[in-house]
């Protein structure tokens, strides 16, 4: 069986789409989910529920150690050219995309975090 280092090296070479497929396959195979647990807040009042945010800005706070992979992921997600995507990553913290629906924002956040970026939803 391959050792851990070989597995990690193989994962490092994968594209964002390949990593996404791998995560889905692992979730199906082992019956687990990669989603972070969500803390449930107590009922504070009806106004809070009505004011729940529906649009989010995805902010890249740090590219981490895999800057090249993060630039590629930002380029794919935004449709920017390579130079513009690199400048956006170099200028972190920066908003990558604005006013995204919650599901789309969380998906983009997950994709960027998979390649080593630190991302916040605002």
From Swiss-Prot:
One of its GO terms (molecular function) is mRNA binding. This is Large ribosomal subunit protein bL12. Forms part of the ribosomal stalk which helps the ribosome interact with GTP-bound translation factors. Is thus essential for accurate translation. Homodimer. Part of the ribosomal stalk of the 50S ribosomal subunit. Forms a multimeric L10(L12)X complex, where L10 forms an elongated spine to which 2 to 4 L12 dimers bind in a sequential fashion. Binds GTP-bound translation factors. One of its GO terms (cellular component) is cytosolic large ribosomal subunit. It comes from the Bacteria. InterPro entries: Ribosomal_bL12, Ribosomal_bL12_C, Ribosomal_bL12_C/ClpS-like, Ribosomal_bL12_oligo, Ribosomal_bL12_oligo_N_sf. GO terms for biological process: translation. Gene3D superfamilies: 3.30.1390.10, Single helix bin. Pfam families: Ribosomal_L12 (PF00542), Ribosomal_L12_N (PF16320). Keywords: Ribonucleoprotein, Ribosomal protein. Belongs to the bacterial ribosomal protein bL12 family.
């Amino acid at each position: 069986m391959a050792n851990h280092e070989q597995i990690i090296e193989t994962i490092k070479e994968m594209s964002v789409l390949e990593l996404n497929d791998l995560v889905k396959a692992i979730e199906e195979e082992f019956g687990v989910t990669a989603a972070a647990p969500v803390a449930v807040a107590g009922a504070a009042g009806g106004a809070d529920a009505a004011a729940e945010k529906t649009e989010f800005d995805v902010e890249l706070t740090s590219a981490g150690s895999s800057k090249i992979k993060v630039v590629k992921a930002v380029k794919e997600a935004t449709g920017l050219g390579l130079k513009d995507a690199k400048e956006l990553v170099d200028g972190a913290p920066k908003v990558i995309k604005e006013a995204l629906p919650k599901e789309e924002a969380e998906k983009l956040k997950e994709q960027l975090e998979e390649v080593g970026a630190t991302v916040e939803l605002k």
